[in-house]
Structure formats: C-alpha cells, structure tokens
Amino acid sequence: MYTLDDIKKEDPEIASAITDEFERQNSHIELIASENWVSPAVMSAMGSILTNKYAEGYPGRRYYGGCECVDEVEELARERAKELFGAEYVNVQPHSGAQANMAVQFAILKPGDTIMGMNLDHGGHLTHGSPVNFSGSYFHVVPYGVNDEGFIDYDKVEEIALECKPKMIIAGASAYARTIDFKRFREIADKVDAVLMVDMAHIAGLVAAGLHPSPIPYAHVTTTTTHKTLRGPRGGMILCSQEMQDKYNFNKAIFPGIQGGPLMHVIAAKAVCFKEALQPEFKEYQKQIVKNAQALCKGLQSRGIKIVSDGTDNHLMLVDLTPFGLTGKSIEKLLDAAHITANKNTIPNDPQKPFVTSGIRLGTPAATSRGLKEDDFDKVAEAIAMIIKEGESAVEPAKAIIKTLTDKYPLAF
C-alpha cells in the first residue's frame, strides 16, 4: 500500500495540502451534517489496486476481460446492502447520490413530466427539483415545503398532489431534522398513481440501525449516498424491489445510461462499509449520533438559540439566526475561526440569498465518530452560542473550549 511518504516523493505540493487538511480536521470539530470519518479499512479499500481495473457492465456481463475478482467485490457489496436494508435489488455503481437520483428519474420519467419534491429552501436537495439542477430543467416541478412550525404538512402535500397529479413524488431532505412519514407519502402517491422515490442519503445510517423508519417497505425506489451517517466512501446506491427493477431497468439507466466504468475501488470500500454497518457496534454509534444531536440542540436552546422545528429527531438541526439579525455566511466564518466547521444554510422562507442565508446547519456524525459524547456537545453548544451572541470577541474563548475537545479526542489516522 502507498503512503503519504510516497506522495511526498512524487508530488510534495499535494502531500503538503493533504498534511494541512489532516491538521485542519484534527484541530477542528466537524459539524457539517453530510461529513464523517471513514474507518482505516474503508480508506484502504479506496486506495487499493482495484482503482486500476476497468469493468464496464455488471458481474458476469462485463465488456472487459479479467473481471472475476472485481465481480466478487461487487457481488459482496450488493448482497451486504440487501441484507443491511432489506431490499431485493441493489445497484452499487452510482458515483454519487446525485447520479443515483438522475438515473432513477431518467428511467421513470420523460422530459416535461411533473414531479413533486421538497423545496430546497425548506430543506430539500438540488436533485429534487431545484431550477438550477437537471431535475428542475428536464421536468415540471411543483414543490412542497414545511409549515410555520418547521414540519412537513402531509395534508398540504396531499392537496398539492391531488391538484398537480405528479408522475413522481420525491421524499427525503438535506436539511430536515424531523422523522419522515414514508407510509403517509406512499398513501399520497397511491392516490394520484405516482411513483414514490425516497432519497434517504442523510439518514441511511439511522435507517440501517433501526433508529429511523425505513423507506424500503413504502418507496417504489430508494436512493442514498454511502457516506454521511452510513460512514462509507463517497458514492451512491439504488434500492428497490425486483419488480421495479424489471419494470424500469435501473441497471441500464446507470450503465450505459449516465455512467461508463464503475469505480471498483470505491465499490470495494462500500462493501467494507456495509459489513461494518452490519455489526452491533454500528447501532450503538448511531444511537450516540442521535443522543449527541439532542444534547447539542438542547445546549443551544438553553442558551437562547432558536432551532427550526424546535428540536431534532435525527443527526442534524438548523439554527435560525434571524432573532439576532445575523447571516449564516458571517457566522460560518466566525465559527471556522473558532475551529468549528459548519455550513451556512437557508431556513424556511429565508429572506436572504442562498449564498448568504439566515441559518446554519449542524450535524453530529463526524464528531461522534471522533468520540464526543453528550457532555462534550454541551461544551460545543456553549462555544457556538458565544459566537452567535458575542461575535468576533468570542472567537478566542470559543476556540479554547474546542481545543480541550480536540486534545481529548485526537484523530486516529
């Protein structure tokens, strides 16, 4: 296996950037909800010689010779994913969650078909119908959102569906802190003869551990990323019944539809990730993610910080900065100076532009992987609240709090 020393010999500039990034991650508390730390085994699989192998097609039906070993890798990944989520069909080749979503939409829909997805400003995702994304360009999009309390209004979703008669309803989000009722979504979809697609990218780890209701029994087709709460490599996946695969041929939609050769080193890392997620320790890790999110949320609220929907059921939360007249952009910068990594994020009915925003999104998966517990997250909440309330003058005191945590939980790599 190659090491950083090998990179230093060939490319000292890249080696320096990698070293700097390690130091940044080690000295910061990562609260970006979509980030996590993979295991050494997952990382080793991604850096393996499998990156050398081209393998267009699927196991047993490749367009290249010498694929018997990578066939075994892909079969292991598929079978483990089936066991993990209880799905009949799995495709592990999507390079990303966005490409998994694209493949599903292109397999089922025609240009101009009507789809419903959560408004990006209310917590949805670009690929759920945003006008700046392919999904908003190829299809007629009718968005739904959250009510004044920050919850999905399922009666309103049904009302919109009955009016616009969509071909597809997309459930799932990138910034929604509450449990999603997939059963209710399926009932709505059935009333208008729509396909229900669920994007569980953010909550896949919680679903695998049984801490969030699974979409698999209700969705016609489910997509996900393999990183985030699942703690695997960056990549995507499609899951559904064999009947849905037979009807829409998602295999063909991925290859040759929107991709060429699969990334076999990443698929190997996915297989390792799925095996890790099948272990009892993974469920305990997911439980700690939720406990930590609730501790962070309560810690912020007890210090006068407003949380959208007044709480969280999963791994993330949205902080509403409007009571302080602040922007997500400014607070993200101050938090970074205090060695807290978070991202600015729109809140429902946000008056600010998407690159400015009135909120920040916080998540606990990465810091939980690092080892932080509830008491530690209360200290993180203290540091964040100081920054929001006191501004630049609080950067150094907040940074000192964070240093006690990063010293206590150094990165293992």
Curated annotation (Swiss-Prot):
Its catalytic activity?
A: (6R)-5,10-methylene-5,6,7,8-tetrahydrofolate + glycine + H2O = (6S)-5,6,7,8-tetrahydrofolate + L-serine
Q: Which PANTHER family match?
A: SERINE HYDROXYMETHYLTRANSFERASE, SERINE HYDROXYMETHYLTRANSFERASE 1
Q: Cystine bridges: which residues?
A: none
Its Enzyme Commission number(s) read 2.1.2.1
What's one GO MF term for it? glycine hydroxymethyltransferase activity
Q: Which residues carry this modification: N6-(pyridoxal phosphate)lysine?
A: K228
Quaternary structure, per UniProt, is: Homodimer.
- Kindly state which keywords UniProt assigns to this record, in alphabetical order: Amino-acid biosynthesis, Cytoplasm, One-carbon metabolism, Pyridoxal phosphate, Transferase
Name of the protein? Serine hydroxymethyltransferase
